[in-house]
Amino acid sequence: MLYVKEGEIMASIVNKNEVYTGQVIDFTHEGHGVVKFDRYPIFVPNAIKDEEIEFRVIKVKKQFAIGKLLTIKETSNERVEPPCEYYKVCGGCQLQHLSYEAQLQMKKEQVVNLFKRKSNFEDTVIHDTIGMENPWHYRNKSQIPVGKNKHGEIELGFYRQRSHDIVNIDHCMIQDKKHDTIMVKIKRLIEDLNLSIYNEHKHKGELRHIILRTGYYTGETMVIFVTNSKQLSHKNKIIEFISSEFDNVVSIKHNVNREKSNVIMGRTSYTLYGQDTITDQLAEYQFKISDTSFYQINPTQTEKLYSKALEYAQLNGEETIIDAYCGIGTIGSYMSQKAKHVYGVEIVEQAIENAKENAKINHIENATWEAGKAEEVILKWQKEGIKPEVVMVDPPRKGCDQTFIETLIELSPKRIVYISCNPATQVREIGRAHV
């Protein structure tokens, strides 16, 4: 049985490899179904809230277990047939078995629950999730690992669930359709040229990843070859094939990553063909995007997101804005139309160079961009007499630095608009700031 001491789970109530039946009562943040036996949670991928399921326990930990779905005894009305033929093996998507409307509701409920855990946030208003009319083929960036199977055959696709084994695919339901065609033809090229393929276990071989970036509205595509070597073998043949085969490819780049790491890209890139960047558009603004630039992967949703951020900023043209973690200046540029002045700060110097160039392209004259740590640059601006009415925050998944939070409190702007790709860190930091 389960032993509980002062609210702490001391031992598991389930055993590995045994089969159990249970009711799914919730979702994890990854979309897995949650079954509980006497408060002990078992996470079951592909199970849906309110379903009764039979599952086999495949992993047991002190605080939780992992189950494999065997049989659905009572099926949820929200269960749908996944449209992708690779869904059951590919690790790229987790929720195609759940109706899109239910996915939106699940995301809202997860945010609601995060805020409920903070007692002083109980009255926070959480609006409905804003979805898409057609939630397919929206991704403007594909990061495609390349490998070999045990028979020595080239595999090019995405990783299997919870592994680094590659699922060989020729199309993806969520990436730009142009990427499907490029992916298939590049695989044939790799086979024809007999390119050396990287083996992550031995840290030997050449080609690690193919990365594709496409401007959603312009159609311009960049192809990036990530290698474990300083040189790209058969470079001229690769350039000749891709440039003649695809009219939309305006940039071919070589990125060098020699690290024993799961990090996909290295620090050094070379332009082999065409432009250094591609161009895309958000609303009336154009942006140049390099191989390493952070750029939102869902352009139609990004326009909705930035429009909502602009609404929440409540600008009348007299405000000074600080855009922290500004990247290549997308949000700051969007805000500049209704602000007195925008100050953008970003730790990546190349991104700031892109932001300055993008400001010139869009004839934005009321913006200043500076490279450095947000908390340090903002303190410098403060000493220079810059007092923002609005601060925009869009940090990476790990959230904001604690020093930045303290700096933000000291600034005491009238409004903070916090865009987050990780609600858990957002709630944590709002609590730290006592907003």
Region spans (language model):
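Hydrophobic beta-strand signal
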Residues: 54-56, 143, 322
